[in-house]
Amino acid sequence: MKKIVYTLLILTTVFMSCSKWTETEDNKDDFEKAALENLKEKRDAAKWIAEAERTEENKKALDAYWKMLSDYKEKAWLNTGEAGGQVPMNYFWFSGGFWTTQKGVAKTWLQSIPDSVVAISIWGGLGTRPEKISDYQKKDLEIFHKKGSKVLMCWQTPSVGLGLPTSKDGSLSGFDLFHQKYPYAECYAQWPEIYARELARYIISLNFDGYDVDWETCGDHGAVTKEGTPLMISDNNYENIGKFVKEMAKYFGPVGAGHLVTTQAEREANLKALFTASTSGFHPKEAEYIAEFTPYLPANYLTKRYYFCCDIPCTPYPPVFVTGNIEKYFDKHFLQNYNSETYTPSPGWTSPDMDRLGGKYYNSAGSNYQAGNFKVALTKAKAVKEGKVWGIAAYHGQTDYEITHENNEQFKKYLRDNNLKRKYLHYAFTREASRIMDPRPDYSGYVEKEPMIILP
């Protein structure tokens, strides 16, 4: 997509003293010099004004481009199919430690992610309190949002307290702080709801856009115990993870008929209550995060759209995740079928089963970029083009930044096999997959450029 670069100009006007125009004839040289200076200043001012007008035109064009991107990406969150205007989802699980916004290192900025990517999740968490977010990160997030892209958080979610920030003095991890405030013996029954609220408060205070629940019975979280992994406990048909989902869905996820939250007014009331310490049913210790995070709430936090997604790679599927229920709570499901070439489970697996997890409109087929298996993203993109599934997702999507049209054997083979000539400086697989899923009518004006990074 064409990128329009604009420069903000500082306009200055230099005013001449009137006394220069009342000098005596004896100061003729000074008079002529002053007149020439005045003409030069008027000429330069005119040039500056012309530049300012061009700058304003470019700014308007850039704003229009961002609006176009945002409108397009909103349609990726639909679950209606083509008849309702849905367009393909393009999603990254993005390493939390990679987002460092280093000056001169474009790949560490969200702005370097292709404009076709609808959303990312910060995989593994961020570990940063809202007051510690840098000015560079704030600007990066601002521009990423202007493009219509969303930032969620995501990690395997077997336990409570995971992913929360350290204590204010840095002496306790978020996990340890949670368990100190809400001891197992006293709070086990309320743990799922308390964790959902504390996590929602943290995400909102960062000006992020939601949460992606990675719930894996085949995950690497060790033995299942009530104190250690309460959200994996199967009691009462997986009641604990159900409680977590239902509480989180009050604040994040779809709104309207057929969903847990049926009106925007109800969603706004829930968000307001989330940051009100006196809300009925809240634990007294919840007042601590409320007090600490409220100063960092975005101005639009009550009306902002927050998203709730999930990835359930293996059986059994708790009731909240299955077709018929998943639509009530979640916006999207992402398939961890990394070794499959389409939407089906990986060879040797029977899960994840797309039809049991929301169906094709809710789902995106996953690729494991971290493992180097990039090429399946392109065959999965073809499945999207054929309407068999409605998006792609890349685990550790940021690793594709380094891949060009000429430095990766998988990509070069793809070009040869398909008799194609492409030129990509970064994110070759991601961008080619986007081109397959939903191609533009015309690429004749396309020019390959380095990513544009706007600094504070």
What is each PLM-predicted segment?
Residues 18-456:
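Secreted glycan hydrolases and related glycan-binding modules that recognize and/or cleave
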Residues 1-26:
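Bacterial Sec-dependent N-terminal signal peptides
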